[in-house]
Regions:
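Short, glycine-/small- and polar/acidic-enriched structural segments
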Residues: 38-41, 48-200, 205-210, 214-221, ...
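Secondary-structure end/capping motifs
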Residues: 263-349
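Sec-dependent N-terminal signal peptides
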Residues: 15-17
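Bacterial signal peptide processing site
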Residues: 26-29
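Pocket-lining segment of extracytoplasmic ligand-binding domains
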Residues: 122, 203-206, 212-302
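Bacterial N-terminal signal peptides that target proteins for export
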Residues: 2-13
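C-terminal motif of bacterial Sec signal peptides marking the signal peptidase cleavage site
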Residues: 21-24
Length: 382
């Protein structure tokens, strides 16, 4: 019995010692995680992809407001975020949708956002009212303004002169509507010769389709895809592009408040470097960029064909122009910019300013870093 008891005791002591050793080993090991070295970090459609929390904290947060809902024409920003170009520059970039160019500038002016994507002409009007709190463009990503008047050929409006006596629909703050007096001057008609019908942006195309107005003003990158989606064809449309009638305006730019510009010069340089790198990627492979934008659409409501047409119009008429081929993405032709600024001063009845009061190129990357990729490197948009 004594022999059996001793044998059982040794067995119990062995099990206890093994248990204590296992506990000690586990307490000294690092805590386990659900990710492995091969896992992709969690991402969102509006946030750069940090590797971990400490890495995110080391980056400077940059808040961006878009001009409107996220669209395919925002592809350069999305590419730069999702491919980590901003993160490489030490930035954590987030964005939110906009509610029109004027609203984006207004919110940028309040300091809610660090960077706004909007046009310099609305910014000029803001600066006229807020001379001590100015907004400045640090780069232009749309070389041509998307302003137009659009109608149906069946309405019998074949030339701008045929707009006389007609009803044009647009939201009150619409850029093309605000610039209409300048357009009217160029085409030799009185700006008071038309009647304006005001509606919410989402109802603009509906009013035209229902015949409540004879034409609408707005951005052709918004109106044309909407019309095609509603069953119209390009042959059904009569479009008066403002830049075909003497208003050679720039489109949207990358805007900051003067105070932010003074305090964050390096962040602005880093943002522009990463953004125009994204633009180059967009031009090289627009189909991949389009698919990336759609993949980040959390609403799952994006129509790929409509967004494809929008991006096609942007690439052909706004992003890749002879001027951009010469000066690179983000730059301007000083004489052209000066002329459009002077036209805006006259049209908006503003205090005199120069191009230097609304635009600076001192934060742009070196020209060779933001050139348009050669044609041989560009894939078609499919």
């Amino acid at each position: 019995m004594s022999h059996i008891f001793k044998k059982q005791l040794r067995k119990i002591l062995f099990v206890a010692a093994s248990t204590l050793l296992l506990v000690a080993c586990n307490s000294s090991a690092p805590p386990s995680t659900t990710a492995t070295s091969g896992d992709k970090p969690a991402t969102s459609s509006s946030t750069a992809t940090p590797v971990n929390n400490s890495d995110k904290k080391s980056k400077q947060d940059i808040r961006v407001q878009l001009p409107f809902l996220k669209q395919s024409t925002d592809a350069a920003l999305i590419v730069a975020i999702e491919k980590g170009y901003f993160a490489e520059e030490g930035l954590n970039v987030t964005y939110e949708r906009g509610f029109g160019n004027a609203d984006t500038i207004s919110k940028l002016g309040t300091g809610k956002y660090d960077i706004g994507f909007s046009d310099i002409y609305n910014a000029m009007e803001f600066n006229d009212k807020n001379p001590n709190d100015k907004i400045i463009a640090v780069g232009i990503y749309q070389n041509k303004g998307p302003y137009c008047i659009l109608t149906f050929k069946e309405n019998g409006i074949k030339t701008p002169a045929d707009l006389v006596g007609k009803k044009i629909g647009a939201p009150i703050g619409d850029g093309a509507r605000k610039l209409f007096p300048l357009f009217a001057s160029e085409v030799k008609v009185s700006p008071d010769a038309v009647t304006w019908e005001t509606m919410e942006p989402k109802l603009r195309e509906t009013f035209l389709l229902q015949g409540k107005v004879d034409a609408v003003s707005g951005f052709y990158i918004s109106i044309i895809p909407a019309m095609i989606k509603n069953g119209k064809t390009m042959d059904d449309l009569q479009i008066f592009y403002y830049d075909d009638f003497g208003l050679d305006f720039y489109g949207n730019g990358i805007l900051v408040k003067q105070d932010f510009m003074t305090k964050n010069p390096e962040a602005i340089k880093s943002f522009l470097k990463a953004y125009f790198r994204g633009m180059q990627e967009l031009v090289k492979d627009p189909s991949a960029a389009l698919d990336l934008v759609i993949s980040t659409d959390q609403s799952k409501l994006m129509d790929r064909e409509a967004e494809k047409l929008r991006l096609k119009l942007g690439l052909e008429r706004m992003y890749i122009t002879p001027e951009v081929e010469a000066v690179g993405f983000g730059g301007v032709d000083p004489k052209r910019l000066e002329k459009s600024v002077a036209q805006t001063v006259t049209g908006f009845k503003l205090k005199p300013v120069t191009a230097a009061d609304i635009f600076t190129d001192k934060f742009l990357p070196a020209k060779e870093q933001r050139m348009v990729p050669p044609v041989s490197d560009r894939k078609p948009l499919l």
